Amino acid sequence: GYKPGGTNLTYGSDAEDGSFSAMVFETFEPETVDSMEFGIKSDFYDGKARANIAVFSYDYENLQFQATDPIPYQGGVANIPESEMSGIEIEFTALATDNITFDMNLGFIDSEVSSDFEVLDNVLAFQYFFGEEALRYDLRENVNGNELAKTPDFTADISITYETELSSGNSLTSVFQFVKRGEFMQRVNNNPSVDKVPDYQIFNMSVGLDFKNDLSLDFILLNAGDEDGLNSAMTDVFGVAATGLEYIPPRQIMTRLSYKF
């Protein structure tokens, strides 16, 4: 894979007295990734079940990320020399009975920076301003071994679908779904006070009626437990060091009427 390089609108410069060096430059390098994937697909239980398993590995060179410079308000894109990601994905579906279908999707990911590289955490550097660039620079950290940004360690989507035909000739479909998203770090800094995005799990349910006259009526319940899960977060790298939080939608109850023609 390939992502082109580019130029930053804001970037740093080295101090004339040598007290600090630029960490965000006028240009940034292209990002490349070497990927490998091995998979297997298998049907069994007389064709009523199927499993797909994939194992993958990604090696990144010059991974692009949002970086902070010792000079205030000079954030931009920088490159991490080497990083890697590996994992496994499992898909499974089975017709348990004539009326019940079971579906499961699981994902496991491990990621890390695999080379020495120093970054500056804007959350820590924000306490210092113009004239204190050397103090900001002294806060830089080596992120070798840190998790890559926004790569959940575990994801799961499991559902059970029940379908039947009623005595009236209309059909009924019920779906019960469980979704889990594991925790991740929202920046490569891995600052536990702002970067850790915790896991969450939700339950969804729906009941649908398909009538013989091409009308359909669905009752839908999303996030049944009203879980206040955190979907993601983002910390500004350009100066104010503010962190914005994005939550998953609250409990939603919906009715949908549709007509096929």
What are the residue ranges of the model-derived segments?
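Surface-exposed extracellular loop regions of Gram-negative outer-membrane beta-barrel proteins
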Residues: 1-37, 47-51, 55-80, 117-119, ...
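Residues that define the transmembrane beta-barrel architecture of outer-membrane proteins
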Residues: 32-36, 84-86, 150-156, 199-203, ...
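C-terminal beta-signal and adjacent terminal beta-strands/loops
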Residues: 179-189, 209-261
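Transmembrane beta-barrel domains of outer membrane proteins
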Residues: 39-43, 91-94, 105, 161-163, ...
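Gram-negative outer-membrane beta-barrel transporters
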Residues: 57-59, 78-188, 260
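Surface-exposed loop and edge beta-strand positions of immunoglobulin-like domains
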Residues: 29-31, 41, 54-56, 81, ...
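Extracellular loop and loop/strand-boundary signature of outer-membrane beta-barrel proteins
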Residues: 21-27, 74-79, 85-87, 141-147, ...
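Repeated loop/turn-to-beta-strand initiation elements of outer-membrane beta-barrel proteins
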Residues: 46-51, 99-102, 167-172, 213-217, ...
